[in-house]
Amino acid sequence: MAATFFGEVVKAPCRAGTEEEEEEEEQSRRDTPEDREVRRQLARKREVRLLRRQTETSLEAVLLETHPCSKFIIAVGSNATAFLSAFVMNSGVWEEVGCAKLWNEWCRTTDTVRLSPTDVFCVFYQLKSDPSVFLCQCSCYIAEDQQFQWLEKVFGFQPRKSMQVTVLTCRHITDYKTPESTCSLSSPFLRALKTQTFKDALCCPLLEQPNIVHDLSAAVLSYCQVWKIPAVLYLCYTDVMKLDRVTVEAFKPLLSSRSLKCLVKNIPESTEILKKLMTTNEIQSNIYT
């Protein structure tokens, strides 16, 4: 039986959970003290830490519990972060309030203070003119076992239901499930998925079943659904997953959304900044320079 709305839990009879628990118990009986120590060291290495990048000191409290938050915008992936850099962060003064430092099989966040489009990072900013507005640019991969840690340290266990969350991310068009051939689709294109408490108008069609979302974006939306926080995910399906100007500009319909339109001032200037970002990326990606 399929779920009828986002967040519905559909239970099916299955012995897999019991068998997995039995296997874990058997494994723990076979483990030597050295095995357990290796596991502890690996778990410690995979911890997600929130800190101030300039001083490398840990944040003492949950990020959004320290500051009142009315609006939280999260960009996941290089194209989504480039969109925020060009069209949103250009229109105001943003102050860095922290970053997530993490390690996993696919990425290691950078320690550099001056970030470039090719760096791997997860940085949080606060709007100086309205300190209740927060923004996160996350170009790194956050593994499944690290996502709850990230949510715990950013949102906490008692998040404010008065805030609104907007998430931007991309997936390859081959992940889009449709009766038609994906070759006939004009990419890039946007789809949206929202929590039940999100009531604003959407900037694109809703994501059709049986499509699903993945990774940190899915974790954030699930968290907001559970805590009844108004949230929307805008998913851009594209055939180019590297930094790409056409894919970045596919997010432009969001500039008229309630959460972003008050943050954007000069679109022509933002377009020029996007061109410079693309040029910088091309230079850094060229093995001959």
Curated annotation (Swiss-Prot):
In-chain residues carrying the UniProt-annotated modification N6-acetyllysine: K265
GO molecular function, one term: proteasome binding
Principal location listed in the UniProt entry: cytoplasm
Pfam family, one: PAC1
Residues bearing PTM Phosphoserine: S181
Residue numbers of N-acetylalanine PTMs: A2
Location(s) in or outside the cell: Cytoplasm; Endoplasmic reticulum
Phosphothreonine: modified positions: T18, T55
Keywords: Acetylation, Chaperone, Cytoplasm, Endoplasmic reticulum, Phosphoprotein
Chain positions covered by the region annotation Disordered: 1-38
Reported modifications of this chain: Degraded by the proteasome upon completion of 20S proteasome maturation.
GO BP: any one term: cerebellar granule cell precursor proliferation
Alphabetized InterPro entries for the sequence: Proteasome_assmbl_chp_1
Biased segments, Basic and acidic residues type: 27-38
GO CC annotations on file: cytoplasm; cytosol; endoplasmic reticulum; Golgi apparatus; nucleoplasm; protein folding chaperone complex
Tissue expression as described in the entry: Highly expressed in testis with moderate expression in brain, liver and kidney and low levels in heart, skeletal muscle and pancreas.
Family: Belongs to the PSMG1 family.
Subunit structure: Forms a heterodimer with PSMG2. The PSMG1-PSMG2 heterodimer interacts directly with the PSMA5 and PSMA7 proteasome alpha subunits.
Designated name of the protein: Proteasome assembly chaperone 1
Lineage: Eukaryota, Metazoa, Chordata, Craniata, Vertebrata
